[in-house]
């Protein structure tokens, strides 16, 4: 056992070999390296698999009761100051290491085929391997200085991969947005680290926790306001990294990178880094009640905000991005209420489910690109999808499992962890628990909206006369899945027929004069005629992805089905302590858990949350499944036609407000644009004007004045007698005038 811990230092550095070898190959033998580029996927997967095996062995030892292991190497800078580097192995480290390596391996296998035709294939694998190295270094760090070093490396790799296709202006702007937003959090993190060093005189976690809790909390040796400020600055770094409100704005734009990296960022690396930091520092935060309240409040706001912003997105990856934001809010909420176990449990289950969904979306995008084009505005647009079930059955099945898991449907993984968070929230605040519970219904709604628009009904991209441009009225499917051609009725629950049209559309909600989209009106009667023209473009259909892309989906689907078993807690009378609780025992000794093991209460609370989730699924099925399926009658929808005109208008107004809020990202980006970006640019222009007119004016004025003064003196002393006589007579005249 001791030998295993002694060699744990290799964990971060093994994947680094791939980056170094690719770099040396491109430097020394570039032609040969590029010719055999597909071979580099094998060592990348192999080396990360070695780390996974090693991490699994460490995890087994932790579960079997091993203590925390730390190794430090001191680097003396002066006689009074030294930095220590090393590694820390504890339950949190082993959990994160397994998460990073398992998800990372699946993403690398998937990427081999997904990126095979990209010119940046080698660069992609070099970045990915370095990304894994940086994240593994972060989770094994024993102190704040080492954390900060790898924290910056994780951010750098994220920026490189978000802007991987840097020749596209949108990707370059997304990279800059992620960089600038995270700079705010990283600056706060650095100030917080320096502040706690000033308080405790140490960067080491163990020393930091002991000194702070014993000497400061108990003896009141430091100003509590200053300690709270430093803790908030540390938390600010996690807010930016994990895309929590209000520094979440970079996350949807980060979808401009390749889809495999989106899966890795959202499941196990970039956004998980902020959660890891809060979990690592929780023994410190838990002694500062104000910070715990702030953490839980920020988490709750993010839960609700992310869910509402996902409601009306058309881009499949951006919908998943807002879903990630909301689910990370659940984890942050759990950490804020002191439910350490539930937070890590949901981090695990969400990672596998979200990786499955992102890789599934990549499979969908990969199959749609030959049909609609390679622009993300089209290939990622759910408006152009539909009916993919018969073309991509394996992708559909795995995506469906991931969707059910994220909706919190038992017995899939996320059900157990999410409901444990909601259950523990009741102990902290009924208001928080109620909001978290009802947000589960929103999650179920937008996830099934995504699933139904993508897989159910008919393939909409092959309809003749279809335009994929955003200014096309056909394009504008709203939150409720219908045409958006009129400003008042653009967001109706379902498009309805024109009164001049004698035919009837039985499942429309309102019988009024709003014009139905032609593709919906003719869907059942003349669907096949849309595919009868001879244009070869319209004869294209999606196809199932290759085996190397399907294999990771199937493995992640298995994880999604069964990984929840590690944390199922029935209570001592029914079953022994679950695996996750045994795993976390050394870490949980440092914390006061705010959780309950009452199985009856868990089932009762789970019944409410699952019922709300099923209600969200039902509403999504009503609003989306009825339009794009072959069902002829849906009496619930038809009942809306009986409402009076005032009620319909009021309902439309409410829907418009919800749609506009969601589609426009809650107007937060607009606010930042007007207040911060334009404000900073205005200040920059003012500073530039002041510099040009005042600073440069004074400097240039002195130079010009010196020039003319020199020219004048040169002219006077130029050796001309007439000038001397004129100057002499002028001086004599002045003297005579003064004398008189």
Curated annotation (Swiss-Prot):
Parts of the chain that traverse the membrane: 9-29, 39-59, 89-109, 125-145, 147-167, 185-205, 231-251, 259-279, 281-301, 328-348, 355-375, 397-417, 426-446, 548-568, 607-627, 719-739
A Pfam family matched in the record: Proton_antipo_C
Locations listed in the record: Plastid, Chloroplast thylakoid membrane
InterPro entries: NADH_UbQ_OxRdtase_chlpt_su5_C (IPR002128), NADHpl_OxRdtase_5_subgr (IPR018393), ND/Mrp_TM (IPR001750), NU5C-like (IPR003945), Proton_antipo_N (IPR001516)
GO molecular function: NADH dehydrogenase (ubiquinone) activity; quinone binding
This protein's UniProt keywords: Chloroplast, Membrane, NAD, NADP, Plastid, Plastoquinone, Quinone, Thylakoid, Translocase, Transmembrane, Transmembrane helix, Transport
Entry membrane topology: Multi-pass membrane protein
Cellular-component GO terms for this entry: chloroplast thylakoid membrane
Gene3D superfamilies linked: 1.20.5.2700
Annotated GO biological process: ATP synthesis coupled electron transport; electron transport coupled proton transport
EC number of this enzyme: 7.1.1.-
Reactions accelerated catalytically: a plastoquinone + NADH + (n+1) H(+)(in) = a plastoquinol + NAD(+) + n H(+)(out); a plastoquinone + NADPH + (n+1) H(+)(in) = a plastoquinol + NADP(+) + n H(+)(out)
General function of this protein: NDH shuttles electrons from NAD(P)H:plastoquinone, via FMN and iron-sulfur (Fe-S) centers, to quinones in the photosynthetic chain and possibly in a chloroplast respiratory chain. The immediate electron acceptor for the enzyme in this species is believed to be plastoquinone. Couples the redox reaction to proton translocation, and thus conserves the redox energy in a proton gradient.
Quaternary organization: NDH is composed of at least 16 different subunits, 5 of which are encoded in the nucleus.
Annotated NCBIfam families: NDH_I_L (TIGR01974), PRK06590.1 (NF005141)
Similarity annotation: Belongs to the complex I subunit 5 family.
Protein known as: NAD(P)H-quinone oxidoreductase subunit 5, chloroplastic
């Amino acid at each position: 056992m001791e030998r295993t811990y002694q060699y744990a230092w290799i964990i971060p550095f093994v994947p680094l070999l791939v980056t170094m070898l690719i770099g040396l190959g491109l430097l020394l033998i570039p032609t040969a390296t590029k010719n055999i580029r597909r071979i580099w996927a094998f060592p990348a997967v192999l080396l990360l698999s070695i780390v996974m095996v090693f991490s699994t062995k460490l995890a087994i030892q932790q579960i079997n009761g091993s203590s925390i292991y730390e190794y430090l190497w001191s680097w003396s800078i002066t006689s009074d100051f030294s930095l220590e580097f090393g590694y820390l192995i504890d339950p949190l480290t082993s959990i994160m290491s397994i998460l990073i390596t398992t998800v990372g391996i699946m993403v690398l296998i998937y990427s081999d085929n997904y990126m095979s035709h990209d010119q940046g294939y080698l660069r992609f694998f070099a970045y990915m391997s370095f990304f894994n190295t940086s994240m593994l270094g972060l989770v094994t760090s024993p102190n704040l200085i080492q954390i900060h070093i790898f924290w910056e490396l994780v951010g750098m790799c994220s920026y490189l991969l978000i802007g991987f296709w840097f020749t596209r202006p949108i990707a370059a702007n997304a990279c800059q947005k992620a960089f600038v937003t995270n700079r705010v959090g990283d600056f706060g993190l650095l100030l917080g680290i320096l502040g706690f060093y000033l308080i405790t005189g140490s960067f080491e976690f163990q020393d930091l926790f002991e000194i702070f809790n014993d000497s400061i909390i108990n003896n009141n040796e430091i100003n509590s306001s200053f300690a709270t400020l430093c803790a908030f600055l540390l938390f600010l770094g996690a807010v930016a990294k994990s895309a929590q409100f209000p520094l979440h704005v970079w996350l949807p734009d980060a979808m401009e990178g390749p889809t495999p990296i989106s899966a890795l960022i959202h499941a196990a690396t970039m956004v998980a880094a902020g959660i890891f930091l809060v979990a690592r520092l929780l023994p410190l935060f838990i002694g500062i009640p104000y910070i715990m309240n702030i953490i839980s409040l920020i988490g709750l706001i993010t839960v609700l905000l992310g869910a509402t912003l996902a409601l009306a997105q058309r881009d499949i990856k951006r919908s998943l991005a807002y879903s990630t934001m909301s689910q990370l809010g659940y984890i942050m909420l759990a950490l804020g209420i002191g439910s350490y176990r539930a937070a890590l449990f949901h981090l695990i289950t969400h990672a596998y489910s979200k990786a499955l969904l992102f890789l599934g979306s990549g499979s969908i995008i990969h199959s749609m690109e030959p049909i609609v084009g390679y622009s993300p505005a089209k290939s990622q647009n759910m408006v152009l999808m539909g009916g993919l079930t018969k073309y991509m059955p394996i992708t559909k099945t795995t995506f469906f499992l991931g969707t059910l898991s994220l909706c919190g449907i038992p017995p899939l993984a996320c059900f157990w962890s999410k409901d444990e968070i909601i259950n523990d929230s009741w102990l902290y605040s009924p208001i928080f628990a109620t909001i978290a519970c009802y947000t589960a219904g929103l999650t179920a709604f937008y996830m099934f909206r995504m699933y139904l628009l993508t897989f159910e009904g008919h393939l909409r991209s092959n309809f003749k006369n279809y335009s994929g441009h955003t200014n096309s009225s056909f394009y504008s499917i709203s939150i409720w899945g219908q045409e958006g051609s009129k400003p008042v009725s653009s967001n109706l629950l379902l498009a309805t027929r024109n009164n001049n049209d004698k035919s009837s559309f039985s499942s429309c909600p309102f019988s009024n004069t709003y014009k139905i989209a032609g593709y919906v009106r003719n869907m059942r009667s003349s669907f096949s005629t849309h595919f009868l023209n001879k244009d070869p473009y319209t004869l294209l259909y999606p196809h199932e992805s290759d085996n190397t892309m399907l294999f990771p989906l199937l493995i992640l689907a298995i994880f999604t089905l069964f990984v929840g078993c590690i944390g199922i807690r029935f209570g001592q009378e029914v079953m022994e302590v679950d695996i996750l609780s045994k795993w976390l025992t050394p870490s949980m000794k440092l914390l006061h858990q705010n959780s309950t093991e009452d199985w009856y209460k868990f089932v009762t609370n789970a019944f409410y949350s699952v019922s709300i989730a099923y209600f969200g699924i039902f509403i999504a099925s009503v609003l989306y499944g009825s339009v794009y399926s072959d069902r002829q009658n849906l009496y619930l929808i038809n009942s809306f036609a009986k409402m009076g005109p005032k009620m319909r208008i009021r309902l439309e107004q409410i829907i418009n407000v919800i749609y506009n809020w969601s589609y426009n990202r809650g107007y937060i980006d607009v606010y930042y644009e007007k207040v911060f970006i334009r404000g900073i640019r205005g200040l920059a222009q003012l500073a530039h004007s002041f510099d040009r007119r005042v600073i440069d004016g004074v400097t240039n004025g002195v130079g010009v004045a010196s020039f003319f003064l020199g020219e004048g003196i040169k002219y006077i002393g130029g050796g001309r007698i007439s000038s001397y006589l004129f100057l002499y007579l002028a001086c004599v005249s002045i003297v005579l005038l003064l004398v008189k």
